[in-house]
Amino acid sequence: MNKLLECRDIRKVYREGSLDTEVLKGVSFDIDKGELVSIVGSSGSGKSTLLHILGALDDATQGEVDFLGQNLSALSSNKQAALRNKHLGFVYQFHHLLADFTALENVAMPLLIGGIKVTEAKQAAKALLEKVGLSHRMDHRPSELSGGERQRVAIARALVNKPDLVLADEPTGNLDHNTALAIYDLMRELNKESNIAFLVVTHDNELAAKMDRQMHMQDGLLVDRLMTESASVEG
């Protein structure tokens, strides 16, 4: 495998008045192209902050993030945005779908914003919604979908630009257990089909174990790394 993402000694300090709070305390790890990785940790352990830095949505106080061979902190904000829009996908605990638009329109939106023609954008969105099992729900608005269906739409939207890496922050936090398991199975299936890497942060050890590799975060540090041979077991 080739290195997709490299993190070296990532530290993040927030200052309020004279008080410094160190949220990340020197995080280092790599992700290979097409790899499925989870980071497990309780609320407040630094997982979401790390994800924001990896997605070029926030700056590290210290350390370096290289994505596709580029040092994120060395890029201008415009170049960061261009890299983010083309090579990264995002899935959150709350789906953040646009309430007045259908599932098809929500998935097509990133392409339309990027200047793709409406016909092409809708064709790509339709193909992805079919892939996530929602061909019968394309014309429904978010309020007409179940929680699991809304999150499937959010995943399809994250994939529509054909990113190299999807960053998922508690993507099943609002779903019941069985639906959450189905969403993780979907991510594995999409990974196998497209070789898109996934980095998922969660507090649920059982769900995290569905990824190829799990890392554990505690108090701003990766405290251990557990490898699972799920691919060989499944094969």
Curated annotation (Swiss-Prot):
Q: What class of enzyme is it?
A: translocase
| CDD domains, alphabetized | ABC_MJ0796_LolCDE_FtsE
The entry describes its oligomerization and partners as: The complex is composed of two ATP-binding proteins (LolD) and two transmembrane proteins (LolC and LolE).
Q: Please tell me whether the keyword tRNA processing is annotated for this protein.
A: no
Q: Where does it localize?
A: Cell inner membrane
Q: Is the keyword tRNA-binding in the record?
A: no
Residues annotated to bind ATP: 41-48
Query: This chain belongs to which protein, by name?
Result: Lipoprotein-releasing system ATP-binding protein LolD
Its family remark reads: Belongs to the ABC transporter superfamily. Lipoprotein translocase (TC 3.A.1.125) family.
Q: Where is the ABC transporter domain?
A: 5-235
Q: Which UniProt keywords apply?
A: ATP-binding, Cell inner membrane, Cell membrane, Membrane, Nucleotide-binding, Translocase, Transport
Tell me the lineage of the source organism: Bacteria, Pseudomonadati, Pseudomonadota, Gammaproteobacteria, Vibrionales
GO CC term, one of those recorded: plasma membrane
Q: How does it sit in the membrane?
A: Peripheral membrane protein
Domain of life per record: Bacteria
Gene3D superfamilies with a match to the protein in the record: P-loop containing nucleotide triphosphate hydrolases
- Give this protein's Gene Ontology molecular function annotations: ATP binding; ATP hydrolysis activity; transmembrane transporter activity
